[in-house]
Amino acid sequence: EQAVNWDFAAEKIKNENRPLKILNLFGYTGCATLACMNAGATVCHVDASKGMVQWAKENAASSGIADRPVRWLVDDCVKFVQREIRRGNRYDGIIMDPPSYGRGPGGEVWKLEEQLYSLVTLCKQVLSDNPLFFILNSYTTGLSPAVMEYLLGVLLQKDFGGKVSSDEIGLKVSDTGLVLPCGSTAIWEK
C-alpha cells in the first residue's frame, strides 16, 4: 500500500540534481529505504527492532544495492533524532511510519495521537535548509489524512513553503477492483 510513496520519493530524488540525504524513521523492512537508495540518495534507516533492521539489510542485498550509501541503525527513533540535532546532522527528506502504540524498554508508553505533533516538531529540526519532502504514514484509527496534512502544513509550510497533500492508502483487490483501505499518508513537498 505504500508503494505510491516509495515511487514519489524516488521520483523526487531522481529529479534533483544534487546529493541528497534521506532519513527513514521506523524503517521496518526497508522498502522506502531501498527506493531512495536505488534513486541515488544516501539513506539513514532507523528502527528500534534489530530483527527488522537485519531484514532490511537482507532486502538491500537481495535487491543488489547493498553497496549503496546507507546507515543501518537499531535505535529509538526519538532519541536518535535528538542526538542528530545535537550533532548538527541534516537531511533533505524524511520518511516516517510510526507505530500507533508501543512500549519502550523502560516501559514508556508511546501513543501516536499524543506524540505526533512533538515528533514532527523534533524532526523538523534535522531538515536541511533546502528540504525536498516529508512523508508521514499512519495506520492509527482516528488519525485522519486531513489531520496529518494540517499538521505538516502548520509545522513545515511557514518555514519551507511548498505544498501539502494527504490521502488514504490501500491495496487494490483484483476480484472487485475496489481499494481496501490500509492507512493514511500526508506529504509535504517543496
What are these regions (language model features)?
Residues E1-N17:
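SAM-dependent Rossmann-like transferase core, predominantly class I methyltransferases
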Residues N17-Y28:
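Conserved class I S-adenosyl-L-methionine
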Residues T29-A41:
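Conserved SAM-binding loop of SAM-dependent methyltransferases across substrates and taxa
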Residues K50-M52, V74-V78, Y91-L122:
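Mobile active-site "lid"/loop adjacent to the S-adenosyl-L-methionine
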Residues L122, L127-F134:
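Short glycine-dipeptide loop
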Residues P131-K190:
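C-terminal catalytic and target-recognition region of SAM-dependent MTase-like enzymes
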